[in-house]
């Protein structure tokens, strides 16, 4: 597959998430966070089953769509459940720390499996996909074992459509602080997520053997896990605003470093994006949780994820085409300028809305 095909495939995943994201978050607020996560966990098992049997590009697209639906039903509900669980036990102030731990656990798992993935592929190309099935089943079993904190009854509204429209208006128009946090999360999220899909062709272009892709990926995600674990302490030392400004400055550092480097050692600049992801994720998740209405917490988090995914659906294929047309180095230079402007443009309204942070 060309890079355009790869980016198009990921755009299909993101498009499915876009279609399911806000409805799934709204449903989680109505029927319960755990119930939504059960749907997501079941979809993951089904998606990896389809992937393991895929024999055509179309079937792979179908698998990505099923996985995308699963991601949508998990997104928002998992973090909302974490928030209400901590609040119920009097530990709401520790959310950033636990959010970082949750992200670190996921990234550590990805680091370990990435290191083994290439080796498993050499044994049998479909083996990594088959092994995803019991892993997804274990995740589903973990969700089944969860217990949800009972919540007060939601404020009655005339219809679900009216309630959903109320959430959209509140988050995107009425609540300036929430809107600013969402915009910054999208700008920083897309800036770093694009490199997740460009780093392998970048390494190939710098002469790094494919056998090293897994170890490099694993090392990067191990670093991301460490940053996520340290995010609460970093925020405590420097404050929210200074830490997020640092995240914005990591965007040009990462893109410029990768673009200008001509040797394999340039891959070290990829850690700028891992650092960005490890810091901004827990910080902005907490900000959005604090500003979200209690009855619509998962809806707000899902809306933020929807905006991020929609941005990638729009930007992904053109970025892949840009790399195919002008080459990796020139494309990275262009992306560095565009994403730096976007990140700083989103950071300024955030500082005005959250001046005390």
List each model region and its residues.
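Helix-boundary and loop/linker segments of multi-pass membrane transporters
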Residues: 156-157, 169-175, 206, 258-260, ...
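Helix-loop junctions on the cytosolic side of multi-pass membrane transporters
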Residues: 125, 132-159, 348-357
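Juxtamembrane intracellular "pre-TM" segments in multi-pass secondary transporters
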Residues: 147-183
